[in-house]
């Protein structure tokens, strides 16, 4: 059964985004309804290109940070992130750095799972 929660958030302020994400997850039964603490988690932030957050091409770093923070605060440890950029000149690492996801991932100790180079 699919679960959806719509929670308004009119700002990319990190605390406001975190509160909205946390509210949405709680409305759906909490994070433990979706993943167990010992499972591996891959966050896929839509790293299409090396675009700044203002261009709204990739997931905003405040949203990525909110999900990462929620997982860390709930005790999840096996978390990585990754994607396959649509541009042949954009590596996942370059795209993550350009759009702010790399900094957010580093803040929460989340490693890049680079399957492009494998």
Language-model segment annotations:
Residues 1-118:
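N-terminal and secondary-structure boundary signal
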């Amino acid at each position: 059964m699919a679960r959806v929660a719509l929670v308004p958030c009119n700002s990319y302020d990190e605390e406001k985004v975190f509160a909205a994400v946390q509210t949405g997850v709680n409305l759906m039964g909490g994070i433990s309804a979706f993943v167990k603490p010992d499972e591996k988690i891959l966050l896929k932030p839509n790293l299409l290109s090396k675009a700044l957050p203002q261009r709204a091409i990739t997931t905003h770093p405040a949203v990525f940070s909110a999900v990462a923070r929620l997982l860390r605060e709930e005790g999840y440890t096996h978390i990585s992130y990754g994607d396959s950029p649509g541009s042949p000149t954009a590596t996942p690492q370059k795209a993550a750095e350009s759009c702010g996801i790399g900094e957010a991932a580093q803040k929460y100790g989340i490693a890049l799972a680079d399957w492009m180079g494998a």
